[in-house]
């Protein structure tokens, strides 16, 4: 009895293993566009997006690609949030301080000017509910 159960389980496992490559190959490639507020010449800021894009592509075997566009290539630098809100692009890389005219609460997403230092900001975001509060603000704009 145990032998039959073992053989049945082994057979199902082998069938699943044989089918796995076919399932993996049928996964469609997804491409998202990321608009940045920063020019290519600002390697620290713009370069972070290209590194993210390369890392995501690598860990997904090229099945999820992020095309990075510098300021002005799709939308002007200060309209990245609008582009995400309107669905023009799937992702945006910008500073929330650019959008305090839309909602002054965007100021809490940045440390400029005279805000907390990087450790204080990380503590507020990840240990004091800051990220949840910012997500509520961003959600109003479909970001």
Summary of predicted features, one role per range:
Residues 33-50, 71-75:
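Extracytoplasmic "Venus flytrap"
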Residues 5-25:
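N-terminal export signals
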Residues 66-84, 107:
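Extracytoplasmic small-molecule ligand-binding "clamshell" domains
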Residues 42-67, 128:
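Short, polar/charged alpha-helical segment
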Residues 62-64, 80-94:
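Alpha-to-beta junction loops
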Residues 48, 52, 76, 80, ...:
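Stable alpha-helical elements in mature extracytoplasmic
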Residues 19-37, 58-64, 139:
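Immediate post-signal peptide segment of exported/extracytoplasmic ligand-binding proteins
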């Amino acid at each position: 009895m145990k032998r039959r159960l073992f053989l049945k389980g082994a057979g199902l496992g082998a069938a699943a293993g044989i089918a796995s490559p076919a399932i993996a190959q049928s996964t469609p490639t997804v491409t998202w566009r990321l608009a940045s507020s920063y020019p290519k010449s600002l390697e620290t800021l713009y370069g972070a997006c290209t590194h993210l894009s390369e890392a995501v592509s690598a860990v997904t075997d090229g099945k999820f690609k992020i095309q990075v566009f510098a300021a002005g290539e799709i939308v002007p630098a200060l309209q990245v949030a609008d582009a995400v809100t309107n669905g023009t692009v799937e992702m945006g890389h910008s500073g929330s301080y650019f959008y305090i005219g839309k909602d002054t609460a965007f100021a809490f997403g940045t440390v400029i000017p005279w805000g907390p230092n990087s450790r204080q900001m990380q503590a507020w975001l990840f240990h004091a509910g800051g990220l949840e509060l910012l997500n509520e603000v961003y959600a109003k704009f479909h970001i």
